[in-house]
């Protein structure tokens, strides 16, 4: 298929310039490095867990408002992959890099302006300011998925024959990004003393943070544009070669090709209808909702939970907790991929990996329940590490399971559709957390009460993980009855 008009115009000047500046091999390498840098920046969205305390102190946001922001961000991230995949297939990954630029830069610029002008949130226009902030975070969520898919597709198209370069490294870079971001925010320039407080503790200055992110994405957007233009150049050259070969063929030879193409498209449509009428698809979706929903809740409310348990020096502990979580998640993604390949060679079912991570998820929720019930912060960082292990493991096992059950051709559509489940799960559990936090954990004077006020949330999340494990077992039982060896 030739370049679409959109892809043609977006990549036109870069395609003309690149062959005069770099060789084809050098273009490959530069584009790949730029794509990895893009992937490293996509996980900055996870830093939202560090924004809770500054929002509460500086803009008087309630936990409900903060969790609304987190939920809408996740909806933007998880509801759009099927659409973004269709756009990328039709117009190339360069369109996704453009969407990311359009979404990130104005959104972060506006959020910085709102934080630097708290009167917008505290005055009569507070609702409109907050609503616009929600819209900005929806765009940031969409842009995060767009930039990540842009980087992933570019790596896949540049090195399609090696999973390490095409899948593992960009995925790992996404995991590392929250570590990079949390370390970046340790720089003193991002912190400022609260003049209205007698405490010597400093607060994160989100105005400076968001301004910095806007500038970072200007640079990253340019690098992503160059990287995706290389993919368009390769596609353009490939189409020219194919056209030359087609010109040498007769019309008689071309006719069966068209018939075969129509047959393949019809078969693909039938496969999609069969998949989305299969009960296993929906049982798996509910299992994903009940497991990833509580994990997204923990990530979004890491800062407020730390503040409940510790209160003194909570921002420092929140940063440490996020770094520990991110490192554990990144390491687990790599290790799970290696173990899954080993299991496949030894013909061991992947269900043991999935059920192990779900069991660890139950343990993590029970640890959080114990900590909040006893009002003891001991073990918070190790528990955060355990949550990172479960999160990274599940986000590696679930796509692997989809690939094994429904095949490579249907993978993008099926897995992209299943990502709606964690978006809904995140919204449900984040709103549950916010409801308990605002109604039980805040006194009339705005002071925090005993951490046990939030413990009921982790009872529900523990039950959710148990039900998720049971549903996963049902999925494997149904697949086994169909004689599918996974």
Swiss-Prot record:
- Sites where Phosphoserine occurs are at 255
UniProt xrefs under PANTHER family: TRANSPORTER MCH1-RELATED (PTHR21576:SF45), UNCHARACTERIZED NODULIN-LIKE PROTEIN (PTHR21576)
Q: So which domain of life are we looking at?
A: Eukaryota
**Which regions span the lipid bilayer?**
30-50, 68-88, 94-114, 134-154, 164-184, 213-233, 280-300, 321-343, 348-368, 386-406, 414-434, 457-477
- Would you tell me the Gene Ontology cellular component terms? fungal-type vacuole membrane
Query: Which molecular function terms from Gene Ontology are attached?
Result: transmembrane transporter activity
Instruction: Report residues carrying sugar chains.
Output: 60, 131, 194
Q: What does this protein do?
A: Probable transporter. Does not act in the transport of monocarboxylic acids across the plasma membrane.
Family as reported in the entry's similarity comment: Belongs to the major facilitator superfamily.
Q: Where in the cell is it found?
A: Vacuole membrane
Q: What is this protein called?
A: Probable transporter MCH1
Q: Which SUPFAM superfamilies match?
A: MFS general substrate transporter
Where's it mainly located?
Answer: membrane
Any one Pfam family match given in the protein's UniProt record, by short name: MFS_1
Which species? Saccharomyces cerevisiae (strain ATCC 204508 / S288c)
The answer to whether keyword Transport applies is yes
Q: How does it sit in the membrane?
A: Multi-pass membrane protein
Q: Which residues lie on this side of the membrane: Vacuolar?
A: 51-67, 115-133, 185-212, 301-320, 369-385, 435-456
InterPro entries hit by this protein: MFS, MFS_trans_sf
Residue spans, topological domain Cytoplasmic: 1-29, 89-93, 155-163, 234-279, 344-347, 407-413, 478-486
Q: Which UniProt keywords apply?
A: Glycoprotein, Membrane, Phosphoprotein, Transmembrane, Transmembrane helix, Transport, Vacuole
């Amino acid at each position: 298929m030739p370049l679409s008009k959109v892809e043609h115009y977006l990549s036109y000047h870069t395609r003309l310039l690149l062959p005069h500046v770099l060789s084809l091999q050098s273009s490959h390498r530069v584009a790949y490095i730029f794509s990895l840098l893009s992937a490293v920046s996509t996980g900055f969205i996870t830093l939202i867990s560090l924004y809770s305390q500054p929002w509460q102190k500086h803009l008087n946001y309630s936990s409900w408002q903060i969790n609304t922001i987190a939920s809408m961000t996740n909806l933007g991230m998880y509801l759009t992959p099927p659409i973004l995949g269709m756009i990328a297939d039709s117009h190339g990954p360069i369109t996704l890099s453009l969407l990311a630029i359009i979404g990130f830069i104005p959104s972060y610029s506006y959020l910085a302006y709102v934080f630097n002008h708290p009167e917008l949130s505290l005055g009569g226009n507070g609702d409109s300011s907050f609503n616009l902030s929600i819209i900005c975070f929806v765009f940031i969520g969409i842009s995060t998925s767009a930039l990540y898919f842009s980087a992933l597709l570019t790596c896949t198209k540049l090195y399609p024959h090696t999973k390490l370069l095409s899948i593992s490294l960009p995925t790992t870079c996404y995991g590392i990004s929250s570590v990079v971001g949390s370390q970046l925010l340790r720089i003193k320039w991002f912190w400022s003393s609260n003049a209205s407080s007698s405490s010597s503790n400093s607060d994160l200055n989100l105005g400076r943070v968001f301004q910095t992110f806007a500038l970072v994405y200007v640079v990253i957007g340019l690098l992503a544009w160059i990287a995706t233009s290389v993919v368009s150049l390769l596609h353009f050259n490939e189409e020219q070669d194919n056209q030359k070969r087609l010109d040498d063929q007769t019309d008689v030879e071309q006719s069966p090709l068209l018939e075969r193409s129509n047959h393949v498209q019809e078969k693909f449509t039938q496969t999609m209808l069969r998949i989305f009428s299969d009960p296993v698809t929906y049982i798996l979706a509910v299992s994903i909702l009940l497991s990833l929903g509580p994990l997204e809740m923990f990530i979004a409310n890491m800062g407020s939970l730390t503040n409940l348990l510790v209160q003194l020096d909570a921002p420092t502990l929140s940063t440490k907790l996020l770094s520990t979580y991110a490192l554990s998640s990144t390491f687990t993604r790599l290790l799970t991929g290696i173990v899954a390949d080993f299991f496949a060679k030894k013909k061991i079912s992947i269900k043991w990996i999935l059920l192990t991570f779900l069991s660890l998820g139950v343990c993590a929720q029970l640890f959080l329940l114990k900590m909040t019930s006893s009002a003891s912060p001991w073990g918070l960082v190790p528990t955060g590490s355990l949550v990172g292990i479960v999160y990274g493991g599940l986000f590696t096992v679930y796509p692997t399971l989809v690939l094994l059950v429904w095949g490579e051709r249907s993978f993008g559509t099926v897995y992209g559709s299943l990502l709606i489940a964690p978006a809904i799960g995140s919204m449900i559990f984040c709103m549950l957390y916010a409801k308990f936090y605002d109604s039980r954990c805040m006194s009339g004077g705005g002071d925090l009460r005993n951490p046990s006020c939030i413990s009921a949330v982790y009872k529900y999340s523990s039950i959710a993980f148990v039900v998720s494990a049971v549903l996963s077992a049902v999925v494997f039982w149904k697949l086994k009855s169909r004689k599918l060896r996974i």
